[in-house]
From Swiss-Prot:
It is found in: Nucleus, Nucleolus; Nucleus, Nucleoplasm. The gene is BOP1. GO terms for biological process: cell population proliferation; cleavage in ITS2 between 5.8S rRNA and LSU-rRNA of tricistronic rRNA transcript (SSU-rRNA, 5.8S rRNA, LSU-rRNA); maturation of LSU-rRNA from tricistronic rRNA transcript (SSU-rRNA, 5.8S rRNA, LSU-rRNA); regulation of cell cycle; regulation of signal transduction by p53 class mediator; ribosomal large subunit assembly; ribosome biogenesis. Component of the PeBoW complex, composed of BOP1, PES1 and WDR12. The complex is held together by BOP1, which interacts with PES1 via its N-terminal domain and with WDR12 via a high-affinity interaction between the seven-bladed beta-propeller domains of the 2 proteins. The NOP7 complex associates with the 66S pre-ribosome. The PeBoW complex associates with DDX27, BOP1 interacts directly with DDX27. The lineage of its organism: Eukaryota, Metazoa, Chordata, Craniata, Vertebrata. This is Ribosome biogenesis protein BOP1. Residues 66-87 have a biased composition (Acidic residues). Induction: By MYC.
């Protein structure tokens, strides 16, 4: 018996641990009578038959006693079997051979059943089912995006990608022609199409429906608890404790030593005992109980009752007493629709007034209103009025601009309606209702020449070209072109040569205006041409190049605006129909645009394309004046309802800013050709100069700042300043008024 035990200990390491541990679980329940074939090894293990070796006894004892003494054999095998295996390797090899011979010669039903249940250990291995046509391994296929192949096969050859990728048309044709298109997928490892089998399709459908992939799997099998609810006297496992469990741990020793050192150094303090009494946070600890504001901070007083009126008097006036018809109508109304909740009555004296019948009802409704209706505290926003004013720069930082009156040009006997300055800024021309044009020297206020025109001068404009000395004046139904012969004589002579070089065509075309040469007497005064329209002319303005001029006529229809060409002496009407009464026109300084201001709108026309580009809405009752910024992207309009409107053509067709600084109607507006200034003249006798900076950055809005109010004109016939114009080079402004004077502010 001892020999068999020793042999069993020696042979224990040669047996696979997995199989020995799994045999008690896979072994069926013990039967009352074991088979006869399994009893022969037991007799050999007792030593009755001397023909059986010790190795055979150890093998059979290990197979048979695995259910009872498995733990003891394992422990003993762990301690003693290692030395035996190291000392005598040949002996263990003989024991393995003997064990195989004994198992083959003496089959045991228990052993056969266990081996049949264990089976092949690779039966559950699914690695053989993997597709190994592409042998690149478990690497990302994105590594092969820049290569013509996707991997390598078993022979090491490259697996090339398809020559042409399928587009949507190929997919559509496959969907229509291939009956197995719906069960075809693309293999990412090889790039080829795979057709799913019926079993794979059924598996996909089961997974999509939320079922298990295995058909024979039952997720609702009855569960068998390994541990029963009955208390047993024997433990589940009787394995003795390890030897290392009786030896103190060195790691714990180091931890304890560190904790002891921390306690000595005072780094670890014992926990303070908690106070078992509950602590509550005092909400009103910071409140002063004696402060009236603290106690009544959130108090909202109840709304007061309305005071009684005359209808509630015991002796009301007769007009408050209802007639019989009014009383019947009051009784037929709903209680909520009645203006009065009672009928006014009249009593001879106060002591004759009976008790009020609705007193209790009204007190009850008052109590309901007090405790059911929520009260709301309206927070008043205290806004400083200074914060509402936009932060603008100081006017002294925006200089230069005109600040005071420098000169007064006197000579006209009636109101001066229009002004114009020569391109060089040396001469000034003014038109008046006294029927004369006066030419002034700007620096000295001396009247150089007076030209009688025989009518009211509505508008005057100096040619902006420095190579031409020509003045256009609108007098009644004609436009007079005069050569003042001021300044350079060569320029004046070249102007006469330019006008006299015109050769009229043999067949003059039909035009809306007539071009007439001046007589000898008129030429001595300076008149060169006369353009007759047949209708009163209200405005004349030059194009920037000096060859075209636009005229506004006081008539109805599409001929309100005419454009004249000086070099060819031609006139034309640019519009086919009218859009209201035209007030002012202006040429764009840089583009072929014509701005036409009617009473309620400003239209921007493209002359080359002959189309409407934009329509500006000033939101004014009556537009009176118009001016275009020298850059051409901004427009200002004045109106008779004392508004000045600034338009940004790149921003919107609505006003960018509306200024209401004047108290009466605006008569004229003007931009300075060089400085960021614009001015407006009004019937209140003042000229307001504003700083208008336009930035090159389109994301930055223009800066508009009023800088100066200039006064000096005397109101005459309820008229003040009639025209305003800037000096072309200096920050000066000219103004003409109804008092018959022209004033220069510098």
């Amino acid at each position: 018996m001892a020999g068999s035990r020793g042999a069993g200990r020696t042979a224990a390491p040669s047996v696979r641990p997995e199989k020995r541990r799994s045999e008690p679980e896979l072994e069926p329940e013990p039967e009352p009578e074991p088979p006869l074939l399994c009893t022969s090894p037991l007799s050999h293990s007792t030593g009755s038959d001397s023909g059986v070796s010790d190795s055979e006894e150890s093998v059979f004892s290990g197979l048979e006693d695995s259910g009872s003494d498995s733990s003891e054999d394992d422990d003993e095998g762990d301690e003693e079997g290692e030395d035996g295996a190291l000392d005598d390797e040949g002996h263990s090899g003989i024991k393995k051979t003997t064990e195989e011979q004994v198992q083959a010669s003496t089959p045991c039903p228990r052993t056969e059943m266990a081996s049949a249940r264990i089976g092949d250990e690779y039966a559950e291995d699914s690695s053989d089912e993997e597709d190994i046509r592409n042998t690149v391994g478990n690497v990302p296929l994105e590594w092969y995006d820049d290569f013509p192949h996707v991997g390598y096969d078993l022979d090491g050859r490259r697996i090339y990608k398809p020559l042409r990728t399928r587009d949507e048309l190929d997919q559509f044709l496959d969907k229509m022609d291939d009956p197995d298109y719906w069960r075809t997928v693309q293999d990412p490892m090889t790039g080829r199409d795979l057709r799913l089998t019926d079993e794979q399709v059924a598996l996909v459908r089961r997974l999509q429906s939320g079922q298990f992939g295995d058909v024979g799997f039952n997720p609702y099998e009855p569960a068998v608890d390994f541990f029963s609810g009955d208390v047993m006297i024997h433990p589940v496992t009787n394995r003795p404790a390890d030897k290392r469990s009786f030896i103190p741990s060195l790691v714990e020793k180091e931890k304890v030593s560190r904790m002891v050192h921390a306690i000595k150094m005072g780094w670890i303090q014992p926990r303070r005992p908690r106070d078992p009494t509950p602590s509550f946070y005092d909400l009103w600890a910071q409140e002063d109980p004696n402060a009236v504001l603290g106690r009544h901070k959130m108090h909202v007083p109840a709304p007061k009752l309305a005071l009684p009126g005359h209808a509630e008097s015991y002796n009301p006036p007769p007009e408050y007493l209802l007639s019989e018809e009014e009383r019947l109508a009051w009784e037929q109304q709903e209680p909520g629709e009645r203006k009065l909740s009672f009928l006014p009555r009249k009593f001879p004296s106060l002591r004759a007034v009976p008790a009020y019948g609705r007193f209790i009802q009204e007190r009850f409704e008052r109590c309901l209103d007090l405790y059911l209706c929520p009260r709301q505290r309206k927070m008043r926003v205290n806004v400083d009025p200074e914060d509402l004013i936009p932060k603008l720069p100081r006017p002294r930082d925006l200089q230069p601009f005109p600040t005071c009156q420098a000169l007064v040009y006197r000579g006209h006997s009636d109101l001066v309606r229009c002004l114009s300055v020569s391109p060089g800024g040396q001469w000034l021309v003014s038109g008046s209702d006294d029927g004369s044009l006066r030419l002034w020297e700007v620096a000295t206020a001396r009247c150089v020449r007076t030209v009688p025109v025989g009518g009211v001068v509505k508008s005057v404009a100096w040619n902006p070209s420095p190579a031409v000395c020509l003045v256009a004046a609108a007098v009644e139904d004609s436009v007079l072109l005069l050569n003042p012969a001021l300044g350079d004589r060569l320029v004046a002579g070249s102007t006469d040569q330019l006008l006299s070089a015109f050769v009229p065509p043999e067949e003059p075309p039909l035009q809306p205006a007539r071009w007439l040469e001046a007589s000898e007497e008129e030429r001595q005064v300076g008149l060169r041409l006369r353009i007759c329209h047949g209708k009163p002319v209200t405005q004349v303005t030059w194009h920037g190049r000096g060859d075209y001029l636009a005229v506004v006529l006081a008539t109805q229809g599409h001929t309100q605006v005419l454009i004249h060409q000086l070099s060819r002496r031609r006139s034309q009407s640019p519009f086919r129909r009218s859009h209201g009464q035209v007030q002012r026109v202006a040429f764009h300084p840089a583009r072929p645009f014509l701005l036409v201001a009617s009473q309620r709108s400003v239209r921007l026309y493209h002359l080359l394309r002959q189309e409407l580009t934009k329509k500006l809405m000033p939101n004014c009752k009556w537009v009176s004046s118009l001016a275009v910024h020298p850059a051409g992207d901004n427009v200002i309009c004045g109106s008779y309802d004392s508004k000045l409107v600034w338009f940004d053509l790149d921003l919107s067709t609505k006003p960018y800013r509306m200024l209401r600084h004047h108290k009466k109607a605006l008569r004229a507006v003007a931009f300075h050709p060089r400085y960021p200034l614009f001015a407006s003249g009004s019937d209140d006798g003042s000229v307001i100069v504003c700083h208008g900076m336009v930035y090159n950055d389109l994301l930055q809005n223009p800066l508009l700042v009023p800088v100066k109010v200039l006064k000096g004109h005397v109101l005459t016939r309820d008229l003040g300043v009639l025209d305003v114009i800037f000096h072309p080079t200096q920050p000066w402004v000219f103004s003409s008024g109804a008092d018959g004077t022209v004033r220069l502010f510098t």
